[in-house]
C-alpha cells in the first residue's frame, strides 16, 4: 500500500515540483500505522537491527532526562527486551520494549508489547501483543491481549487529572 501511495504522489507532482530520491540500503521502516509502529519497535529486539543503530556511535539521538538506570527488583524476570532508564521491574517482561519511567508491578506479565513512557502497571496485570499509551495507569488485575492484531490500550489516567 505504501509503495502505491508514493507512486501516486510522484506521478501527480512530477511535472509541478522538483522531486529527488535517496536510495537507502540499510534498515528503514514506514511507521504510518499502529501495526507498523509496533513492528518497528519489535524489530529493535533483533540483534542485527539493534546493533546497527547502537553498537558503534549511536545514530539515534534522544533527549536526556537524567533518570536512574532501570531497577530490577527480586523476582523480576526480563528476557529479550529493551528497558529504558527510570523503569522499575517487579514482574515478568518478555520480548517487549519499555520506554522510560515504566513501573511494572508484582506478578505482572508483559509479553510482545510496547509500553510507552510514564506508564504504571498495577500488580497482577497481564499485557500481551499491545501498545500501551504514554502516561497510562493500568489498574491491578487488568488483562489486555491483542489477538491476531495489535491492541492499543488507553486508560483513564487518575494520576494526572487537574
PLM feature spans:
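Left-handed beta-helix
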Residues: 3-162
Amino acid at each position: 500500500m505504501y509503495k502505491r501511495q508514493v507512486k501516486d504522489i510522484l506521478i501527480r507532482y512530477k511535472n509541478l515540483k522538483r522531486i529527488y530520491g535517496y536510495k537507502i540500503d540499510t534498515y528503514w521502516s514506514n511507521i504510518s500505522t499502529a501495526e507498523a509502529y509496533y513492528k518497528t519497535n519489535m524489530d529493535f529486539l533483533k540483534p542485527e537491527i539493534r546493533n546497527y543503530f547502537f553498537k558503534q556511535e549511536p545514530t539515534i539521538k534522544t533527549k536526556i532526562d537524567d533518570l536512574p538506570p532501570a531497577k530490577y527488583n527480586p523476582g523480576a524476570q526480563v528476557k529479550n527486551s529493551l528497558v529504558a532508564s527510570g523503569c522499575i521491574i517487579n514482574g515478568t517482561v518478555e520480548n517487549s520494549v519499555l520506554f522510560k519511567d515504566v513501573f511494572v508491578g508484582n506478578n505482572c506479565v508483559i509479553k510482545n508489547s510496547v509500553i510507552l513512557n510514564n506508564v504504571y502497571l498495577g500488580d497482577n496485570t497481564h499485557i500481551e501483543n499491545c501498545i500501551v499509551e504514554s502516561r497510562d495507569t493500568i489498574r491491578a488485575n487488568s488483562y489486555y491481549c491483542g489477538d491476531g492484531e495489535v491492541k492499543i490500550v488507553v486508560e483513564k489516567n487518575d494520576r494526572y487529572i487537574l
